[in-house]
Amino acid sequence: MALTASVKEELSRLDIKKSSVRKAEVSAMLRFAGGLHIISGRIVIEAEVDLASTARRLRAAIAEVYGHQSEIIVVSAGGLRRASRYVVRVVRDGEALARQTGLLDGRGRPVRGLPSAVVNGSAADAEAVWRGAFLAHGSLTEPGRSSSLEVTCPGPESALALVGAARRLDIQAKAREVRGVDRVVIRDGDTIAALLTRMGAHDALMVWEERRMRKEVRATANRLANFDDANLRRSAQAAVAAGARVDRALEILGDDVPDHLKYAGELRVAHKQASLDELGRLADPVMTKDAIAGRIRRLLAMADKRALDLGIPGTDANVTPEMLDE
């Protein structure tokens, strides 16, 4: 699955309980994916997204948080449209929902940015704004020299609101206009990783980080002359770096780490140059490569989230240039 789709699928499964956070996410999704239309004298809201799971999440939130019914319309692929699109449409209660979510102000005028209640909300609300905006119109490219996380915005006001939400999370994002389209872009790898964590895309983050580490190690290895086994060296470097991150994760979490994650982490630390296959065989009972990798991913994600909450360095703090250069 492409990185963008994997992030959106994971975010669509995220279980959020707090009402204000769900409202912030819905407001952002409708702002960045939606539009207001007048049909037969009624205000109708339509939000077009690229995944069925995103459409289902939005429809459920509209019903559970605001009590309004909506329908999902599938626009099949064809012509210039390479993939199916999904339109969430609210007809009967369109005007009420538009006012509740801040698409319209108290006088019934369209709001171009985000409602003040969302803009001035908590850090969790800011995370929800980014989650909703990314689900609506976000993309994540492969890590590398041109890697980026970006959101296409309906206008400069919403772009500035999204930059402001990022700033409340101590994340630097830039608003740009490219060929008449407003976008908010993040290019720094560490900043992308921090935002994925704040949005709740922990599994996708681990995939992205693994690919990022692999590319960094590969770039370093390619500069080494007359080395007969570059692939083995890259794997060993990546394993050592992963071991250092796990070591830091165990330090951050202390006694709060679940036993099964702690066991996988201790295996990684004890055998820093072993492959995932080898780690699985060393486990008792024996584990598959995917099982050991999944536990390590969850351990690192949990530690990085804790580090963000505490304002301390995350698991990358233990990865030194020497681990990649040797």
Curated annotation (Swiss-Prot):
Presence of the UniProt keyword Cell membrane in the record: no
Biological-process GO terms, alphabetical: cell division; regulation of sporulation
Record feature DNA-binding region, as residue ranges: 275-308
Protein origin, superkingdom: Bacteria
One Pfam assignment: WhiA_N
InterPro entries, per database record: Homing_endonucl, Sporu_reg_WhiA_N_dom, Sporulation_regulator_WhiA, Sporulation_regulator_WhiA_C, WhiA_LAGLIDADG_dom
Keyword Ribonucleoprotein included in the entry's annotation: no
Matching Gene3D superfamilies: Homing endonucleases
MF terms in GO: DNA binding
Coiled-coil blocks: none
Keywords: Cell cycle, Cell division, DNA-binding
Purpose of the protein: Involved in cell division and chromosome segregation.
NCBIfam families: DNA_bind_WhiA
Family of the protein in this entry: Belongs to the WhiA family.
UniProt protein name: Probable cell division protein WhiA
Organism per entry: Pseudarthrobacter chlorophenolicus (strain ATCC 700700 / DSM 12829 / CIP 107037 / JCM 12360 / KCTC 9906 / NCIMB 13794 / A6) (Arthrobacter chlorophenolicus)
Gene: whiA
